[in-house]
Amino acid sequence: MPKEWYISFHGGDEKTSLNNIHVYSTDGKKLRKALNKKSVPEGITLRELRGFAFGPDKNLYVVNAYFEYSEVLKFNGALNKDGRHDFAGVFVKRHTDLNPGIDHPFNVAFDCNGDLYVSSQNTSIVARYHGPAGKHGQPGLPMPFPQSLDPDLNLPPGTFVPSAKHVSNGLVEVREAIFAPDNNLYVADRAADCVRIYEAHTGHFLRNLVSGSDQVDRPIHLLLSPDGRYLFIGSGGTDSILRHDLRQNSTKVFVAPKSGGLNGPAGMAFGDDGFLYVASRNSNEILRYDTKGGRPSSKPFIKDLADNPEFLMLVG
């Protein structure tokens, strides 16, 4: 099967809101919706989908971010006869007492052990949940606090990286969290104008990788280069993309402010064609930039989207 682009959108209750992951061909043609809504049971509503990832079990995990829902849904990784993913269950569900940490979640990431990490905007934490294999606990339930956290702190169950309300090196306004090749967790802190690094297994705060002095301004999305050398940072305050060299510990502007019409950099992904694809959230476009020098293509890859694009992934 040829590779395809999966794109999530802001969603909501407007007529133009797109509350599904939409599929596009590698030449920008709209193909279909990725998630089979007919398979979703009554009582579950897809609204404001954000980050999504294929888990270690090959199934598709999707953030259902609307604050009243605040959950991670699981869909079969294998496509049905219509080329869609059928609903498989609610993997992580918000609960006022047992799981209050997941609140308006943003993205999901799996660690090398197959456990799931979820960043939540309203609580400004990254929470950790037992992965689908359930090696040490029931899949989807909050995991114990890492050893770096004081057990006497009144933290939501499953907290891996706490908010700045609880610890000095905590998160002020969390957005995307991803794992690097060194297995450490890189977290965009939008309001603090920095990307923070936490040790993978202990949750120990290591350092701020980049900050305002490196021209980081309201970072939201993160992406690692295929070789793991560079970290790309969407800088929302300047409508630019920075590239941090993890070996040299140096940061440069890779995509200049508003280059190619960039307005609200959101999800980023590499294509197989030598381009970096970027969701331009406020202009409802998917843009392309040369991976060598950050030069924009002469025209948008996809334009006139009905809703604000959020996350994108090349699948196949």
PLM features per residue range, with description:
Residues 1-33:
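An edge-strand/N-cap motif at the start of beta-rich repeat modules
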Residues 2, 16-18, 40-57, 95-113, ...:
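Beta-rich, blade/repeat-based domains predominating
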Residues 4-8, 59-62, 115-118, 184-187, ...:
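Conserved beta-propeller blade signature
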Residues 10-12, 65-67, 121-122, 131, ...:
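Short loop/turn segments immediately following the C-termini of beta-strands
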Residues 19-22, 71-74, 124-128, 193-196, ...:
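A short loop-to-beta-strand structural motif that recurs across blades of beta-propeller domains
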Residues 25-29, 76-80, 130-135, 199-204, ...:
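Short loop/turn segments that connect beta-strands within beta-propeller blades
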Residues 30-43, 86-99, 141-168, 204-213, ...:
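A short beta-strand motif characteristic of beta-propeller blades
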Residues 281-316:
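Blade-level signature of beta-propeller repeat domains, shared across WD40, Kelch, NHL, RCC1
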